[in-house]
């Protein structure tokens, strides 16, 4: 692999990584979106309740993504350096954090699901449906925290097909069990939103079992919880310094983005129902963009781990150009899917009106997301620059987008679509600062260390 980054060209390497990651991201989005799509056959209240409850899964995903980012950027560079022992240690550190967080959130979901729903809505029916859904989803959170870290480590080593296979399996099982619990197939009871939560939990449990099987067959990188107890002060310090800003960045952005749902949730169930389907379509439109960002981050990490910073800058330039293309493609995908979504959706007239124009707004919004994700989460993080994203996104979301949304909705009482349009300006506001940081080249660093385990060997 270390020779590969030196001998092969950028595009040949990036496309080998992109396709499996895109398929994985598409399936990962599909696993979470299948709940909302299939609940279309149950009713608008079920869609709205699950859409609001899913905000917790979205926030948790941001947490796991932040932890996985710290693991990925360290593991990618140490893989470029050829240090497998360091990779195992980093995996254990990431698992330690993810398991603790998963247990805490699952415990709250088991015991206080009504309280969790009241943060998003005061509608009694939505609270009842969402609470039942969340209580079962606690099982999903426990499994998810483990599998996301293990698959992130495998991706950082370029083993992206394994992650793709795991997500394909989870998606297929989720859709199958969803159908069983929604339509009562094969003798299963019709359980509506609760059945969808059970289906998701079952698919995640089986995905975890699949990861354990992969681990048993692997010669070097195992899914071994004993890794959590490996102690290395230098790597722990590096992981915390890199992961905490990334985790803070993703949490800050994720919670702020959930505030969009809070705003829309208080503008009526029609806005919530429309937005729940828009999120599904937007996730499909952005999978290629996120795939390029993830693949670029892995490739740049390997190159910088080898110490070739100039080549990393050259690759980053090509990656940005590729991102603009994928952003345009993503917008066209949303535009192309829109007629089918409008034909498929079973919403009332007002919600359908919102849905149509929200989808059109997202045809350009994806370009802003694509550029920022590639630079902040791909290029900058590959070189260990995680603090910039934290500062940039926190200011953008909490000082601009969220206050703007609340003022537009509750002070000026603008129409729903105007509120949504203003919320969707968040990505473009930060472009000047993100592009300035990219052009500075300050993100290009080799963050690996030599002689990590010398003190242990002396003892």
Where are these regions (language model features)?
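Transmembrane helical elements of multi-pass membrane transporters/channels
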Residues: 16-35, 136, 147, 170, ...
């Amino acid at each position: 692999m270390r020779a590969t980054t030196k001998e092969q060209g950028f595009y040949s390497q990036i496309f080998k990584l992109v396709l499996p990651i895109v398929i994985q991201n598409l399936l990962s989005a599909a696993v979470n979106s299948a709940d909302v799509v299939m609940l279309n056959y149950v009713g608008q209240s079920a869609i709205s309740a699950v859409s609001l409850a899913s905000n917790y899964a979205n926030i948790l995903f941001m947490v796991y993504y932040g932890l996985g980012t710290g693991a990925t950027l360290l593991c990618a560079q140490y893989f470029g350096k050829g240090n497998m022992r360091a990779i195992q240690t980093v995996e254990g550190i990431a698992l330690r954090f993810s398991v603790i967080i998963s247990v805490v959130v699952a415990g709250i979901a088991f015991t206080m699901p009504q309280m969790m729903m009241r943060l998003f809505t005061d509608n009694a029916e939505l609270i009842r449906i969402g609470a039942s859904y969340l209580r079962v989803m606690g099982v999903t959170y426990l499994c998810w925290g483990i599998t996301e870290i293990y698959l992130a480590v495998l991706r950082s080593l370029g083993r992206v097909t394994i992650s793709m296979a795991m997500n394909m399996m989870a998606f297929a099982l989720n859709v199958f069990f969803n159908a069983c619990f929604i339509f009562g197939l094969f003798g299963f009871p019709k359980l509506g939103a609760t059945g969808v939560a059970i289906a998701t939990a079952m698919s995640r449990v089986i995905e975890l079992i699949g990861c354990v099987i992969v681990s048993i067959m692997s010669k070097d990188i195992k899914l071994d919880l004993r890794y959590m107890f490996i102690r290395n002060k230098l790597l722990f310090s590096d992981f915390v310094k890199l992961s905490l800003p990334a985790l803070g960045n993703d949490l800050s952005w994720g919670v702020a983005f959930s505030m969009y749902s809070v705003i829309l949730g208080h503008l009526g169930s029609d806005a919530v129902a429309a937005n729940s389907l828009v999120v599904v379509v937007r996730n499909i439109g952005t999978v290629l963009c996120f795939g390029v960002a993830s693949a670029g981050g892995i490739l740049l990490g390997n190159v910088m781990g080898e110490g070739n910073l100039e080549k990393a800058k050259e690759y980053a330039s090509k990656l940005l150009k590729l991102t603009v293309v994928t952003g345009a493609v993503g917008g066209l995908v949303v535009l192309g899917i829109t007629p089918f979504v409008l034909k498929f959706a079973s919403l009332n007239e007002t919600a359908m009106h919102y849905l149509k124009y929200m989808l059109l707004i997202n045809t350009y919004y994806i370009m802003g997301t694509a550029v920022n994700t590639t630079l902040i989460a791909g290029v900058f993080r590959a070189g260990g620059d995680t603090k910039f994203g934290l500062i940039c996104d926190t200011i953008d979301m909490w000082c601009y987008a969220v206050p703007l949304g609340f003022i537009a909705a509750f002070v000026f009482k603008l129409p729903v679509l105007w509120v949504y349009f203003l919320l969707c300006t968040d990505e473009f506001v930060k472009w000047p600062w993100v592009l300035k940081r990219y052009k500075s080249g300050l993100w290009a660093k080799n963050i690996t260390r030599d002689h990590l385990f010398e003190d242990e060997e002396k003892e």
